[in-house]
Curated annotation (Swiss-Prot):
Induction: Circadian-regulation with peak levels occurring in the morning. Residues 46-69 bind DNA. This is Protein LATE ELONGATED HYPOCOTYL. Residues 19-73 form the HTH myb-type domain. GO terms for cellular component: nucleus. Residues 513-530, 570-582 have a biased composition (Polar residues). Disruption phenotype: Early production of scent at the end of the light period, associated with an early peak expression during the day of floral volatile benzenoids and phenylpropanoids (FVBP) pathway genes responsible for volatile precursor synthesis (e.g. EOBI, EOBII, ODO1, EPSPS, CM1, ADT, and PAL). The gene is LHY. Keywords: Biological rhythms, DNA-binding, Nucleus, Phosphoprotein, Repressor, Transcription, Transcription regulation. It comes from Petunia hybrida. It comes from the Eukaryota. Homodimer. Pfam families: Myb_DNA-binding. Its main location: nucleus. GO terms for biological process: circadian rhythm; green leaf volatile biosynthetic process; negative regulation of DNA-templated transcription; regulation of circadian rhythm.
């Protein structure tokens, strides 16, 4: 046996890394000698050894070399002599391994110091907690770490090299506390604060002089002026980019002019910066200019502290938003300190949050709005929206008067055109931008409060009770009483007008509502239909002078509630889908509970029930025509529970008699139910009789006359041209899909149970649904 052919005398391993499958021939002496020659010449270059041997592949050569080297080491270990003395051959050293593609540290580098591990492969490969607090690591891209002691210029060059390679990357920096944002304004040797605890998982940027490279030639990057006393800091990337009101900056794009005008108007309230800041800022302008455009920038104010920031490519400012935010004062006192007076010097320095779109994001319902600037952006919408709101209010004079009166109490400090305290606004004040914005803000706040209470806008945060002016619930009731439909469901039901008796002058309505609110709390109840919610709002919001009209509205709604309760019976025959009448019954029961126990809406319960109420409102408003149980089905349910028989055993004659009696009673009750104000109708009958009203009227006439032949004539109308369908006996059929199943005779049950002809009413297109 060739001693070099195999390593059988070695320890047999359980798993071999590679096995030759095609060529099983052993190595010959000639091949092994050429292998040894090539090994001395080329070392571990297997490709060159393959060319030198010519009969073996590189994989075979490497496998043979592995076995050969293992055999040599074992023989040298047994003899106790070096390998070079055993066979006069030196095993070439292993080639240096490739650099790992993954940034994770190996097991052997656990005890290695942090700096060595971080620069081993040119990438930051240490876990997050092991980064030193006083050292900021950089992703140098095969560049050594430069300590930040006296190395500001070197770090600027390092940043330049980094930005060339990572131009499109953003830097996610984690803020480890408020101490990272503390900056001394008196120091002239530092314009950018170094965060002591700012770290990253993948890359961490040490902030020093020259990090923000301003493009002086193009004037497209926000340039810090000499007397703006701002200091830039890279902090939390999760927050939005916030411009300080005193920062006279030029924004990206074409919004530069509006921001400069707005900032120049606010710059007079700021303290002055030392003169050497101008010289130092000029020096900073000349650092390399290839820093990425969209950099997380933090603007510090000398009086109010720091707010995290981040720029986005789609950032833009509206002129209207700038003017509105600049003119709004004192709104933060609603949450922080109700007793303190709001002055322009106190809040003009606060940072304004950027508006990425025309409408700001709503805050979650569980997190109170603690930042007054966020609340300003929440309420201050664009001038286009304000003009739309005011134009909608002008269509209803009473609603506009109420909104104007509410705007007079609104904490919107109007410096250009203040609103009169009596609520009598002239046309010039209404058309002016600040007054129009105040009216729009009050209207939006009232609608927001109503929606938050009734579930149409679940994400909106409700108002708190720390108001120093008119409470928001009273303000919402002002708008609801004087304009129940225009403010809330104007888009859905634009043709429906409010009743004439509800329109009142704005001051009287507001004063009466203030007295009512001071006497007792106003109950709020969820609504299941827009018409019912309108009636309840009118009933809750009427003043003492309209008590009689309010009683009329109450009497109008009470028969409807009783009728709904009489008509709805919960089925125990296997139909687990509630009809919309059951949903309306639940809503009316909740309404009565809310009237008996008037309580303020719980903030924690609003979030859970708001979505259900919202979905219920949308479905009941738009889809009542097909969700309603048909008239025949409702009559069959009443007959079912009164006679205690199964629906399969209904006979045609008995059902028609029962239905005729019930319809006759309903026909007598309908004229009495319409009430004094003819606009109040039975909602259930109006929705359910869309498709079957003509049939019911014809049947009622025939039953009143007692003519059986007329009933037979009416039967084809119900069957839509005598279309008789074959239906197999499958047990209980829901009356939502098959409203009536009558049999020709009860005697035919025993003979033809498999196939029986049933009178099945086809559904019209208005009711057809899957």
């Amino acid at each position: 046996m060739d001693p070099y052919s195999s390593g059988e005398e070695l320890v047999v391993k359980t798993r071999k890394p590679y096995t030759i499958t095609k060529q099983r021939e052993r190595w010959t002496e000639e091949e092994h000698n050429r292998f040894l020659e090539a090994l001395k010449l080329y070392g571990r270059a297997w490709q060159r050894i393959e060319e030198h041997i010519g009969t073996k592949t590189a994989v075979q050569i490497r496998s043979h070399a592995q076995k050969f080297f293992t055999k040599l080491e074992k023989e040298a270990l047994i003899k106790g002599v070096p390998i070079s003395e055993a066979l006069d051959i030196e095993i070439p050293p292993p080639r240096p391994k490739r650099k790992p593609s993954n940034p994770y540290p190996r097991k052997t580098s656990i005890a290695v110091p942090t700096s060595q591990v971080g620069t081993k492969d040119g990438k930051l490969s240490t876990p997050f907690p092991s980064i030193c607090e006083n050292r900021n690591l950089l992703d140098l891209e095969k560049e050594p770490i430069i300590e930040s002691v006296g190395g500001n210029e070197k770090l600027s060059n390092v940043q330049e090299n980094q930005n060339k390679k990572n131009f499109s990357q953003g830097f996610t920096l984690f803020k480890e506390g408020a101490s990272a944002a503390s900056v001394s304004l008196g120091k002239s040797s530092q314009t950018l604060a170094e965060p002591t605890d700012s770290c990253t998982l993948n890359e961490s940027v040490s902030v020093s002089k020259g990090v923000i490279n301003h493009d002086v030639a193009n004037k497209s990057f926000p340039a810090v002026e000499s007397k703006g006393h701002q200091q830039l800091d890279i902090l939390d990337a999760k927050q939005s980019f916030q411009f300080d009101s005193s920062c006279n900056t030029s924004s990206v794009g074409k919004s530069c002019q509006s921001n400069e005008k707005w900032a120049q108007g606010e710059q007079k309230d700021q303290p002055s910066q030392p003169d050497h800041f101008e010289e130092f800022s000029r020096n900073d302008m000349q650092v390399p200019h290839n820093y990425p455009r969209h950099v997380p920038v933090h603007i510090l104010d000398g009086t109010l502290g720091a707010n995290g920031a981040q720029t986005t490519p789609d950032m833009f400012y509206h002129k209207s938003v700038s003017h509105q935010v600049g003119g709004l004062q004192g709104l933060s006192d609603m949450y922080t300190n109700p007793a303190s007076s709001a002055t322009s010097e106190q809040h003009s320095n606060a940072a304004r949050s950027s508006i990425h779109q025309s409408f700001p994001c709503f805050h979650p319902i569980f997190t109170p709005i603690r930042d007054p600037d966020d609340y300003r952006s929440f309420l201050q919408l664009s001038s286009t929206f304000s003009s739309l709101v005011v134009s909608a209010l002008l269509q209803n004079p009473a609603a506009h008067a109420a909104a104007s009166f509410a705007a007079s109490f609104w904490p919107y400090a109007n410096m250009e055109a203040p609103v009169d305290s009596t609520g009598n606004n002239t046309a010039s004040q209404i058309n002016s931008a600040p007054s129009m914005a105040a009216i729009a803000a009050a209207t939006v706040a009232a609608a927001t409060a109503w929606w938050a209470a009734h579930g149409l806008l679940p994400l909106c945060s409700p108002f708190h009770s720390s108001l120093t002016c008119v409470p928001t619930s009273a303000t919402s009731m002002q708008v609801d009483v004087c304009q129940p439909k225009e403010g809330k469901s104007e888009g859905r039901e634009g043709t429906h007008n409010s009743p004439p008796h509800v329109q009142q002058p704005g001051p009287e309505c507001s004063e009466a509502l203030q007295e009512q609110h001071s006497a007792s709390k106003l109950p709020t109840s969820p609504s299941s239909d827009s018409g019912e919610s309108e009636g309840r709002n009118l009933k809750n919001g009427l003043t003492a002078t309209d008590t009689e009209q309010g009683a009329a509205v109450t009497e109008t709604h009470e028969p409807n509630a009783e009728k709904v309760r009489k008509q709805v019976d919960r089925s125990s025959c296997g139909s687990n889908t509630p009809s919309s009448s059951e949903v309306e019954t639940d809503a009316l029961e909740k309404d009565e509970k809310g009237k008996e126990e008037p309580e303020e809406p719980n903030v924690n319960l609003l979030a859970g029930d708001a979505a259900n109420r919202r979905g219920r409102n949308c479905i009941s408003n738009s889809n009542d025509s097909w969700k309603e149980v048909s008239e025949e089905g409702r009559m069959a349910f009443q007959a079912l529970f009164s006679r205690e028989v199964l629906p399969q055993s209904f006979s045609r004659s008995n059902y028609l008699k029962t239905k005729g009696n019930i319809d006759f009673e309903k026909f007598q009750q309908k004229p009495d139910e319409q009430g004094p104000s003819g606009s109040q109708l039975d909602l259930n009958d109006q929705a359910s009789n869309i498709c079957s009203s003509h049939q019911a009227v014809e049947e009622n006439v025939q039953f009143l006359l007692g003519n059986k032949e007329g009933a037979e004539k009416c039967q084809p109308t119900m069957e839509l041209g005598e279309i008789r369908l074959k239906a197999r006996r499958t047990g209980f059929k829901p009356y939502k899909r098959c409203s009536l199943e009558a049999k020709d005779s009860r005697v035919a049950n025993s003979s033809c149970q498999d196939e029986e002809k049933s009178c099945k009413r086809l559904r019209l297109e208005g009711e057809a649904s899957t």
